Amino acid sequence: MKKDDLSKKLTPLQYEVTQNNATEPPFNNEYWDNKSEGIYVDIISGKPLFTSLDKFDSGCGWPSFTKPIVKENIKANTDFSYNMKRIEIRSKDSDSHLGHVFDDGPKDKGGLRYCINSASLKFIPKEALEEEGYGEYLKLFNKKEE
C-alpha cells in the first residue's frame, strides 16, 4: 500500500508509529492493559503477530509478549537510534515498525519481551476470530480450556 493511501487509512498516530518509527506514550495506548483473549494483527496487512496467551504485564506501559504467533510474519533489524543498540521488530509483509524485542522477558517463557506499540496493532477478540477470517487460531484458545 502506498504511503498516501496509508495516511488516509490510518490515524495520525498509527501512521507515525508504523511508517516513521515513532513510539507512542507508555500507559496511554490502546492495548497496554488489554486482558481480553484474542490475537493481535498488523494494522496494515492484517497478518497475525501475537496472541493474548503470550501477553504479559512487563510494567513498561506497552503491550508485551513472550513470542510472536507466527515468527515468519516479523523481521528484526538492529536499531542504533537514541544512542542505543536495540533490536527493532517490523512486520514482514507491510514493513511497518512494531516496536522492539529485549532479553528481559519471563525466563520460563524463553526470556524475551516483545515490546510493541498498540498503534501498530489491531486486536481481534477470540469471539470474532472466525468471523474476521482468523478461525484457524481458535484452536490455540481451545487447547487452554482442555
Swiss-Prot record:
Catalysed transformations (reactions): L-methionyl-[protein] + [thioredoxin]-disulfide + H2O = L-methionyl-(R)-S-oxide-[protein] + [thioredoxin]-dithiol
Key words of the record: Oxidoreductase
GO CC annotation: cytoplasm
Enzyme class, broadest EC rank: oxidoreductase
Gene3D superfamilies reported in the protein's UniProt record: Peptide methionine sulfoxide reductase (2.170.150.20)
SUPFAM superfamilies noted in UniProt: Mss4-like (SSF51316)
Highest taxon above the source species: Bacteria
EC assignment: 1.8.4.12
Record-level Gene Ontology MF annotations: peptide-methionine (R)-S-oxide reductase activity
Active site: C115
Record bears the keyword Ribonucleoprotein: no
Disulfide bridge positions per record: none
Annotated GO biological process: protein repair; response to oxidative stress
Domain MsrB stretches: 3-126
Family from the record: Belongs to the MsrB Met sulfoxide reductase family.
Protein name, as recorded: Peptide methionine sulfoxide reductase MsrB
